[in-house]
Structures are given as C-alpha cells and as structure tokens.
Amino acid sequence: MEHELGRRTFLKGAGAFAAAGASAGVINLAGQQNALADHHASAIGGGTYDFDSVYDRVGTNSVKWDRQITKYGSDDFKIGMGIADMDFKAPACIGEALEARTKHENWGYLDSTESLKEAICNWNKERYGIDVAQETVTIASGVHPGLIAALLAISPPASKVIMNTPTYNGFWTDLKWSRTVANENKLIKDKNGVYHIDWDDFEARLTPDTHAFLLCNPQNPTGNCWSEDDLLRMGELCLKHGVTVLADEIHCDFVNKGQTYTPFASLPDKAIVDNSVTFKAVSKTFSLAGMKNAYFYSTNPVLLERVRYYHRADLNTLGIVANEAAYREGAPWLDALLPYIDANHDFAEQYLKSQCPDIRYKKAQGTYLAWLKMEDLVTGIDAKAKAEQAGLKSPEHYMEQWLVERAHVQLNPGS
C-alpha cells in the first residue's frame, strides 16, 4: 500500500476488518479512490450528508488511531481498521445538544433518565415495531456492565455460558468478571461462506451446569442476522433446558440491503421472550462509545429485578444528553448512512474477489464489520513459526504486526 494513501480510500469510514487467518500479500489499493467514490455515487445517488470528506481523528485520544500510532509508530501505521467504531462525524444534532447543555456550567447529580427511556422506546417502536414498556428499561453505562450483572444474577461461579463462535472477543472479559466459563458452540460455514448453527452441538451443550446463552444478534463478527426460525429454535431449546437467553443486539441498526433484523423480544412465543434479557445501545450507530450509555430490558419482571440487583450505573450527564439527541433526531442521518455502508460491503466483496483472490470475504448480512478469511495465506510466510519465535499469541497476531509493517493497515487479528 502506498504511504500517501488516504485512510478513506478503501471502505471509507466503516468500522473494523477482522482478519481470520492472515494475509501474505500486500493489498495495493492505490488508485482505487475514484472507483470507490463512483461506486458510492451509483449505489446511493447523492444525499444531504457528507460521508466522503476525510475526518482526521488523530490527536483525539482515539483507541483506533492514537493507540496504534503509539504501538507501531506513525511511519508504519497509516490506516486503522481494527476497532469497531466509525470515522464519520456524528450527526449535528448531537453536538448541538451537547453545546446547549454545556452552557449550564454545572455538573451536579442527575435526577431522572425517564426522557431518555421514552426516546429509547420510541426508537424501538418506530424502527423495529417493538413495544418496549418504559418501566422495563434500565439505563446502563455500557452493554458490558449489563451483561456482567445478568451473568452474576443467573450463573453461579464456574458455571458455563454458551456462545456461538467465532464471536466478539469482549464476551470473554464478561465471563471473567462474572467468574463463568465459555461453552463454545462453533458455527458451521457452508461452501458459500455463510455461517449456520450446529444444532446438535448446541443442544448437547445445554447441560445442567449451563445457565446462560450469550446471543449476538446481528452476530459479531460473521454478520449473521439470525432468522426468526433460528431465534425461535434457540429460544425453545434454552427454555426446555432452563438456560436464560442474554441477547446482545448492539449492531441491530446496521442491516444490509435485502436482510432483516429480528429482535429476540419480538418473537411470537411469550414464554421464550420471557426467558430473555435484551441489551442494546446506539454507541455503534452514532459513534458514541465514549459517552458510556446503553440499556437493557426484559418482559419478565422477576428476571429483570434479579439483574437489576447486581447492576450499578454511574451515568454521565453528557452521555445522557448525547444519546437522547441521537434517538430523537438522528434517524435521518442514519437512514442516509445505511446505503453508504451497504455500498462499502459491496465494494469490499467485489474488490477482494477480483484483486486479492486469496482473501475471502462474503458480504455480511448485518453490522459494519468485514470478517476476512485469510488462513490459506498464513503458510505463505510461515506465520505460525514466526509467531512462536516472536512469543506472540497466535499466527493471526503475527499477521497483525506484519500487515502494519508492510501494508500500513491495522486489523483485528480475529483469534
């Protein structure tokens, strides 16, 4: 990759590439900027919002950018694609709401989050047709604190938690804090690169020492938007074996063209829904991760109170303001963004297929993540042996370093 390549040249602004395996070839994207711009123009047809202008986040204490410069140096590191946040400016309504609040110049204790809860309920109703009762919503400082509280409430120490793997690596931290153990139901990949549940294995793992199923919907990193039939089958099996479903749906606002997000709480079987807690946020949707705000809810009051007992949220005034502004006024911005992200996925799939055939990518159904399959290329540079020599965790971690040094792009190792 050329050193002078702008970081928006390839997949402008869209989240993280996760490298499953590793690349033995440098992806030469020089000269692709116009092609991507044309692709977006043809796919979207213009609009009110500018998602093309380069927005420099360096110097903002960003994990995605500044941490990588500290780690690798600015000569090697040029493009950050290893953290799941976007590089677009947030919609103006958020900045305007924050500016208005800062004029009060006092940061005393918060009184109520009811207005935010109302906005959350309206968002779910308007976008997904879900009737979420306001009294069932609990505001959290992130999805992780909510999940940890739920695991503490329902899972004794050393008990097992089912997860469909590959999955979001942050879940292992939640298990650590709740002193629980991963029970991995490995997804099956078909010849077309699409992942499916191994149902026999899933049910076999619903053992008496398993108390929770940590569902990711849409799934990180594969991008699966689980169908209603899949969700019902998962829920039915969990209910049968006394396992509670914890549905992390943080990526639900990103669904690609022709796909459908089905909220677990919208399933037609009340008993299945009552056996679940849903966790959501718009931190991905509007790049608000630093504002530390999320929520969870359940239709089961007994289960909800058990989780609330273990949950504590020290909320941030500006986080409340920013999130409420996003829920109430951010929809037009998001509606304009979604086809842009969809076009990014299309471009990535087409470009990699034609220019980098050893890197396999199947367009995700949802999320703004790209799950790249590169394991065939690990052998090309003997990454396994070199990782061992360097004392690195895996060949993928060696390849993360290798890609930064040669392609100047930082990806999530995916292992």
What are these regions (language model features)?
Residues 1-18:
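N-terminal secretory signal peptides and thylakoid transit peptides that target proteins
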Residues 43-142, 149, 328-329:
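N-terminal small-domain helix-loop-helix segment of the aminotransferase-like
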Residues 47, 152-215, 225:
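PLP-dependent aminotransferase-like
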Residues 178, 240-241, 407:
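Helix C-cap/helix->beta junction micro-motif
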Residues 189-259:
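Active-site phosphate-binding strand-loop segment of PLP-dependent enzymes
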Residues 275-354, 359-364:
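PLP-dependent aminotransferase class I/II
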Residues 341-342, 355-406:
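Conserved PLP-binding catalytic core of the aspartate aminotransferase-like
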